[in-house]
A protein has these predicted regions:
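Bacterial N-terminal signal peptides that target proteins for export
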Residues: 1-11
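N-terminal export/membrane-targeting signals
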Residues: 13-16
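N-terminal amphipathic/basic membrane-interacting segments and domains
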Residues: 24-397
Length: 397
């Protein structure tokens, strides 16, 4: 083989190898991103289970987050020539090509703690976050059983509280029955969760408004001039508190919407108000009151206590409640076993036991949705993990 032909073959092979390296880079990057994403998600999920186990043993909860992931990929190619093992010695050279891919990840983890996170962990959720999850298609039965700590009902002017706690038998059963009633209305696609929309109006003398003041008013209000009275009438649309109903609240007169908003406004922001009226689906059992939401820390304690100390039990619906789809005994069925369950894809070991979510049987989907909801609520609680100024551990491979 002549030297020119050898060089030509070498150049062709080198070109092919460089193209091959370029083709390998995107798949390698994709696999790495997906692998890190799965690892971080799995880490958070297991921490949630681990903290339920800690709360089960009345120990403090704690979370650790990944603050930074940096990975460097090194793609290398090399080429050379070597004499062949056969043929006339010294006359034939064999081109040699090679390549390698190296990954050098650096992962920084830091504790999620401090006053700000602790305050968010202990602060009850507001109605806006509850409504956001409900509007994403969340089951109101699951949402309220996990997020609400009590039901408050107006009984002839008296505010009566029913706790979402199995130790309070009368309160727990009333809470479950009302939640089931709302769930039945939702299953029939007759449940509304809307803000009270209305207008506020003001009247001011025209001579009290300067040209600059008029321009400022136009930015925030709808302005109409009354030449006879020489006044300006200001109107401003208001989106008030959220109300769960079995009717369309926009069909109510404005005065009624204002009254409902003002009633809800007297309650704290972690109250979710509801109004079930006769004459509409589910109106056979008229109800009016609020659900008081709890904090993420209280949710973990509720799930932990339901394992052994305060187990939930079956509650049947009220006779006035329409048909519904699901009524699981437990908000989330947690298994505590001596050995690791083979059928579970999410298990942690703590205090000599294996904690897992029951994903077998007819309620497998319910339990998965319950854990997914817990994960989403944690994401709503935690702030961005700090990347500086806190003790951290950096792992370099």
């Amino acid at each position: 083989m002549t030297i020119p032909s050898l060089l030509l073959r070498g150049l062709i092979g080198l070109t092919v190898l460089m193209n091959l390296a370029g083709c390998l880079s995107p798949p390698t990057l994709t696999r790495a991103v997906v692998s890190y994403d799965n690892a971080i998600t799995d880490s958070i999920s297991k921490q949630l289970l681990l903290n339920i186990a800690r709360a089960h043993h009345h120990q403090p909860v704690h979370f650790t987050g990944v603050s930074n992931v940096a990975a460097t990929f090194d793609f290398r190619i090399n080429a050379g020539a070597t004499p062949t093992l056969t043929g006339e010695a010294g006359k034939t050279l064999l081109p040699v090509f090679g390549g390698s891919v190296a990954e050098n990840p650096t992962i920084s983890i830091a504790p999620i703690d401090g006053e700000e996170f602790t305050r968010r962990l202990l602060t009850p959720f507001q109605e806006t976050k509850f409504t956001l999850l409900l509007r994403q298609g969340g089951d109101i039965d699951l949402l309220l059983r996990l997020m609400a700590k009590e039901l408050r009902v107006d009984d002839q002017g008296e505010d009566i509280a029913y706790r979402n706690s199995p130790t309070d038998k009368a309160g727990y059963e009333m809470f479950r029955k009302v939640v089931l009633h709302l769930s039945a209305i939702q299953d029939a696609n007759r449940l509304y969760a809307e803000s009270m929309l209305f207008e506020r109006t003001w009247t001011i003398p025209a001579e009290s408004v300067t040209a600059e003041g008029f321009k400022a008013l136009e930015q925030d209000y709808l302005v109409a001039y009354d030449p006879q009275q020489k006044t300006y009438r200001l109107r401003k649309p208001v989106s008030g508190r959220i109300l769960i109903t079995n009717y369309d609240p926009n069909t109510l007169p404005q005065e009624e919407r204002v009254r409902l908003h003002e009633e809800a406004e007297r309650s704290p922001m972690n109250d979710v108000s509801f109004d079930i009226r006769p004459g509409h689906y589910g109106g056979e059992w008229p109800l009016k009151g609020e659900f008081r939401l709890r904090s993420f820390n209280t949710m973990l304690n509720f799930l932990a206590q339901s394992v052994e100390e305060e187990p939930e039990y079956a509650v049947e619906k009220d006779n006035r409640t329409p048909p519904f789809m699901d009524n699981p005994v437990k908000t989330m069925d947690l298994l505590v076993q001596e050995s690791s369950p083979s059928e579970s894809d999410l298990t942690v070991q703590s205090h000599g036991k294996y904690y897992s979510v029951n994903i077998t049987g007819p309620l497998a989907r319910w339990n998965r949705e319950a854990f997914k909801l817990l994960y989403q609520l944690f994401q709503m609680t935690v702030t961005e993990v700090s990347r500086s100024g806190v003790p951290s551990i950096t792992i370099a491979k």
